[in-house]
């Protein structure tokens, strides 16, 4: 039985080593390579733009041909940009509250860009018909507008009339965050029946994304028939298309680590939806779209349908709010909380709750760690006692092993009888470790995928809890004027984590098995290198958790 425990602990350590080793030695170098490629690509694109002098002053990237098209300016607390009156396309959107990086002059994050720009990314809501004779607004239609500015206080009303006298009306509203509501109305003044279908699409030119194997999802996503559908860019590229016929579509879209663009169709009917890939003129494009059933509008009648577009930051409370307000199933799952969703989201709520009082997510992590420790104190106490008893029983266990070395069945019976007699649970020593594994991964997920943690400072030199510790001992934490390679970026917090881990081991009962004891001695050093590239918020949690464990073990040693 003792061997089983050792094997269990070894398996846990090995699993963690493989997961984090993959992250450190495979994913991180790949990320760096891709980031370099992206930087080179951006530099080349900028050079081309400068040579052609096609930059539009208003948005900084819209080419000159686009600047001739009339636009409706978007202005809210969270967004700026414009909507093209040609084709009524949402293709110019900037997130005002978020910078691309921490540098002083960093530009704001751009989400949508016109179709003929380098990072084309846009959304449309419109109408189609199964009859070619029906004249509907299309991508070349120039809409008439009653206003030049769209804001939360001022909706925009647009209209267009075809040659048969059919009037098309569109009302666009935007809230103070990232949600657009588009209501389309068709008034059939003609003498013919009008078959129409409402559609929505999001189209994106493929750009290299941050690799995060088994860490988070990036790419097409949606809730169809109340099931979450996630497809990577590679999945859709291989399949070319993933179709869903006559389904309940709550939402579909394209997600990045922190940003989401999503279509939210009217709930009045089912929709056909598609996740598509296309290669046109050497350019890779991905598209998600939906289309409604045919609606027949008789002469003299009118028809209205309402759809929504979400385009912005994946804030937890905001997605929760929209999910409840508009009954959008699984909208919060656009944030990839991972396998431990039922733990990860409550952990975030706890951190966010204390952040509301202390104003610092780093301090919030410390408070949540204390609460978790208090909840697990009784279990840790029992675990410590069990480990102590197991060590005291080791000589007797060795005697039984020697006595019944040729009879494994009898050997196990005798060892189990000894455990029962001494009232020892051999698994109890592992329980705190097993319980903390999902908590650890949950905190890691919260730090890695939630926008609330992005560029969030702690104290001192820590300006971003979601990024690695920027210091390193190999240049004396910045005193020496050179930057070591990435694998030598071992900062103050990783070192503190390793030191506290070593001290905790010294205060814990040493494993009875000599080999296991030797392995455990090297774990602080292994974890020092392994976790140096992880979010510093995770290292703050682990270091603080180790310090609390040391205090806890001191208390148990003194009073037991």
Swiss-Prot record:
Similarity annotation: Belongs to the OXA1/ALB3/YidC family. Type 1 subfamily.
InterPro entries per record: Membr_insert_YidC (IPR019998), Membr_insert_YidC_N (IPR028053), YidC/ALB3/OXA1/COX18 (IPR001708), YidC/Oxa/ALB_C (IPR028055), YidC_ALB_C (IPR047196), YidC_periplasmic_sf (IPR038221)
Gene Ontology cellular component terms for the protein in this record: plasma membrane
Membrane association type: Multi-pass membrane protein
Domain of life: Bacteria
GO molecular function, one term: membrane insertase activity
Assembly information from the UniProt record: Interacts with the Sec translocase complex via SecD. Specifically interacts with transmembrane segments of nascent integral membrane proteins during membrane integration.
Pfam family, one: 60KD_IMP
Keywords of the record: Cell inner membrane, Cell membrane, Chaperone, Membrane, Protein transport, Transmembrane, Transmembrane helix, Transport
Subcellular location: Cell inner membrane
Transmembrane segments: 5-25, 334-354, 357-377, 431-451, 476-496, 522-542
Protein's name in the database: Membrane protein insertase YidC
Function: Required for the insertion and/or proper folding and/or complex formation of integral membrane proteins into the membrane. Involved in integration of membrane proteins that insert both dependently and independently of the Sec translocase complex, as well as at least some lipoproteins. Aids folding of multispanning membrane proteins.
A biological process from GO: protein insertion into membrane
SS bonds (residue pairs): none
Encoding gene, per UniProt annotation: yidC
